[in-house]
Amino acid sequence: MKTKNILAAFTLLAASLCPTMAQAQSDEAKMNTFIDNLMNKMTLKEKLGQLNLPVTGDIVTGQAKSSDVASKIKRGEVGGLFNLKGVEKIKEVQKIAVEQSRLHIPLLFGMDVIHGYETVFPIPFSLSCSWDMEAIKRTAQIAAQECSADGINWTFSPMLDICRDPRWGRMAEGSGEDPYLGSCIAKAMVEGYQGQNLAAPNTVMACVKHFALYGGAEAGRDYNTVDMSHWRMFNYYMPPYKAAVDAGALSVMTSFNVVDGVPATGNKWLLTDVLRKMWGFKGMVVTDYTAIQEMTAHGLGDLQQVSAMALNAGTDMDMVADGFLGTIEKSINEGKVTMETVNTACRRILEAKYKLGIFDDPYKYCNVKRAKKEIYTPQNRAFSREIAAKTFVLLKNEGNLLPLQRKGKIALIGPLADNSKNMSGTWSVVARLDDNKTILGSMKKALEGKAEVLYAKGSNLMYDAKREADATMFGREMRDSRSKEEMLKEALDVAQQADIIVAAVGESSEMSGECSSRTNLEMPDAQKDLLIALKKTGKPIVLVNFSGRATVMTWEQENFPAILNVWFGGCESGDAICDVLFGDKVPSGKLTATMPKSVGQIPLYYNHLNTGRPLKEGKWFSKFTSNYLDIDNDPLYPFGYGLSYTTFKYGKPTLSSNTMTNNETISVSVDITNTGNYDADEIAQMYIRDLAASVSRPVKELKGFERISIKKGETKTVTFTITPEDLKFYNQELEYKNEPGEFEVMVGPNSKDVQTLTFTLK
């Protein structure tokens, strides 16, 4: 009888699923019929036009410019356009495509909506430090809502490049050094952008970038060579890309770098064998800015040769270079490209347009009333303020100097204390820069009638004016014409009057980001001298540090009692920073990249291999072990680290079982008690180590985390489930599997301060 009930239930479940499956098959059949009919009418030039993605001059994100765009649209020689700002402008251009081209095919409209649209959220690296997947997903939803209201239907995000070298400026755009956390964020971002229904007017097509391995650039120098084994790339660099594909991302952008000596844009193994055959990706592949043209500089031939190579490799859309539009017809005539290859690429782009619903309604993203109502709303800005406070990482708080009291005189000093243009961070291309909240403005508001705020800029970003100009693209100039002596005197006069100093220093927004690699990750020279002078006053100093990457703060750690890393917090930065400084919010962010003591330690990451001659953690030099003569191996701050205004005590973890098989899971539980004086959030972390395997395995790997709210005096139990999947890795033959044997599971507040248990996989 029980068996009959189970069978009956299964039959009912299958029946309930059948309409959904049938509907999906019916929808796909309709799409295929529609596209077949359309492509039967298209000329070769019109098909190549769908593969063409020129740029407008509204927003500058690269060197090359497109020409004669309107005429090309009329001739059906453009598939999409990017960097056009404003719903009315976009509607005008869409009208040209729909009403003046022969086949009336609507355009895609793309933009780098990286961390918000006009409502700007913290930079992606900062967001990752919140470890809050629902909040991160919500930022993507709001970004999609705003940009789609302004005519955009395609965002070149999320950026999923794992980075172990903070000299690389584009660490700011990613989620740090860990593939597990990066994969969780990839899923959240794609789901946030695309939603449950890509044809809805408030969702946009996501674009996974930069595929692949861009974050592995040698020496951290942007656009530089990448060279790594397949074993390393599949274990550490590929997982976030795959997670985004699994989450349904409909487009992928190629990276500038080589993979196995072949530029990614022309790499058939990467774009066809891995992305499509191994991972099952069905969407469209677009190049990065002029990436096809740049293959000539890589030494792969002239524009015709590299264009054919890219198309044959699996690239579908050419951004800016005009290589496909201008050369592929000749390559077809010469037998170097087949018509089938062109048709396949064209179909993928038309499928994306169909799924977005713009064949049904080309103007669905062009509602002017919606743009006025849904962009930069008070609700969206309030959420930006809320999530920003969750991303800040408290690195040091000696003597509980923070939170500050609302009394007395506070000296706010530094080049980033009152500069709205640098609050939103890199790649905030349509931000309302002048409306961004500054620390000075927000602090005056927070302390009105309670305490006095004294302000001085103190210094420029750096002494060298040209180098400062190089680091302030997108018009974010902040240089003061006064002499360094004049600015320093003003700062010291202000400091002497105050009870406490808040120093707002660090990187400007464009000192990190694209083409912003640095060899020296310490505080810029002018600001370092300012801090030295302020320290000599003897006043207590809170360091508020801005950066788009992990920086070297060894001197600051040794010399200042309190350090709050605020990264770049978006349009509401000033309010969010003051929320944390004055205790309205309790800092809860934790590092997603290891912070080194010296740039000479880089690359430095927590999930490293042990080597045959490891130096024990916390030890200095030991002959014939893997170490340095002049510094220990340990980071300044480990991965996962971050303090709070309260304190948390971890109990002893327990395992549900000491053994598991590939058909079951086990769990590890730990009690966490808030032993301090503030209700606060804690981010508990679980790491796994495979003690004996067929290849060398990392000393630990993140495999679980939970952000949990705990009231003061309260104890909560956090339970992590360990699955067979958590124990899998790519072996030397690139087989993804786990192996029987002994494992360690570690639980704690960061990657260093953990408690360890062992279990066996049978």
Predicted features and spans:
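Acidic surface patches and DE-rich sequence motifs
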Residues: N731
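Glycoside hydrolase catalytic-domain context in secreted enzymes
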Residues: A22-K728, K737-S751, T760-K762
